[in-house]
Amino acid sequence: TWDSRARLLDGLLENLLEFRSFRFIRLKAFVRPDMLVGPEIGRFPDASKVLTGAIDLSWPRAQLFGLLWQYLLNAPTAEGQPGFRELCKQVFHQRLGLHEGVWHGSDEMNTDEETQRSIFEVLAGEFMGSNRLRGYPYTWLPNHLADAYGQVSPRSFLAALREAAEDTDR
């Protein structure tokens, strides 16, 4: 039940507060933001000391696609097949960087949603079906993976794309 979860979460937060007194031990807890909402959370002395240190780990759409590009830029390619790096250079005229053995996309590729949309449309198609009635893959994917607060986790985003790619290969 929600009450038992709230008590467990309060216990976790109280432990985090206790460990603040140890100089060389810093605990971190990853908690879904929706679990921190409600009057029953943080009803113990000095709860605000723990709750005010919360950091938002949300991933906007541009960052999710930037993560996808990073993943694809560094993925191995099949023998004789052009990889994502070649596609970015030849088709999209993107300048890529190689730093310590890791490929990086351009700032435009990682932050500009129009550039990201055009790249993703080449990979996935312009429409979900044969026309726009079923939606556009660039917006459809994050919208359908989002939770009630509009948040998408990088793991579910990449997993959905991996599953779609494997399904396409079959």
Please provide the spans of the model-predicted regions.
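The catalytic "switch" region of P-loop NTPases
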Residues: 2-132
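P-loop NTPase catalytic cores that bind/hydrolyze ATP
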Residues: 117-170
